[in-house]
From Swiss-Prot:
Gene3D superfamilies: Cytochrome C biogenesis protein (1.10.8.640)
Compartments it resides in: Mitochondrion inner membrane
Family note: Belongs to the CcmH/CycL/Ccl2/NrfF family.
Gene that specifies this protein: CCMH
Lineage summary: Eukaryota, Viridiplantae, Streptophyta, Embryophyta, Tracheophyta
Name of protein: Cytochrome c-type biogenesis CcmH-like mitochondrial protein
Principal location class: mitochondrion
Annotated GO MF terms: metal ion binding; oxidoreductase activity
GO terms under cellular component: mitochondrial inner membrane; protein-containing complex
Membrane topology recorded in Swiss-Prot or TrEMBL: Single-pass membrane protein
Domain of life: Eukaryota
CDD domains: CcmH_N
Length: 152
């Protein structure tokens, strides 16, 4: 007969095995954890996890062994390193650079007209009203198309 301590020990092993199995991807099914899959490899991996727990290994050691044997994609939570950060942050960086280039071109286009107009009349004595009129005449009208995309 199993003692109460044996039953508790089996329950602890079972709960640890289930917890680890929920975080390990089935290599055949792809989208299922090995806990939910009935593929042969999933059954084999569940048995391997239970055997490793019974031999006294920690969860971290089991995850490392699985990752070493089957690659990083077997785990649902891949490690966060420089390459992963670059992959996740690259769209934000590209968007920021594109917005910066757009804003720079927009600002540069607006300021160049005023600089050119002021350089045109450098040394010519003009009243402030005449300067304002000259800038109004030389400044191109805003585009009729208010959309950022030319086709709209």
């Amino acid at each position: 007969m199993a003692t109460e301590e044996d039953v508790k020990q089996r329950q602890i092993i079972e709960s640890r095995a289930r917890n680890i199995s929920h975080n390990v991807r089935c290599t055949e099914c792809g989208s299922q954890s090995i806990e939910d899959s009935q593929a042969d490899i999933a059954i084999l991996l569940r048995k391997l996890i239970r055997d490793e727990i019974k031999s006294g290994k920690s969860d971290k050691e089991i995850y490392k062994k699985l990752q070493a044997d089957y690659g990083e994609t077997i785990l649902y939570t891949p490690k966060f390193d420089l390459q992963t950060a670059a992959i996740w942050l690259s769209p934000v960086i590209v968007g920021g650079v594109a917005a910066g280039v757009w804003a720079y071109k927009k600002h540069r286009q607006r300021t160049n007209v005023h600089i050119m107009a002021l350089n045109l009349v450098r040394g010519v004595p003009l009243t402030p009203r005449e300067k304002e009129t000259m800038l109004d005449v030389l400044t191109p009208p805003p585009p009729a198309n208010k959309w950022w995309w030319p086709g709209k």
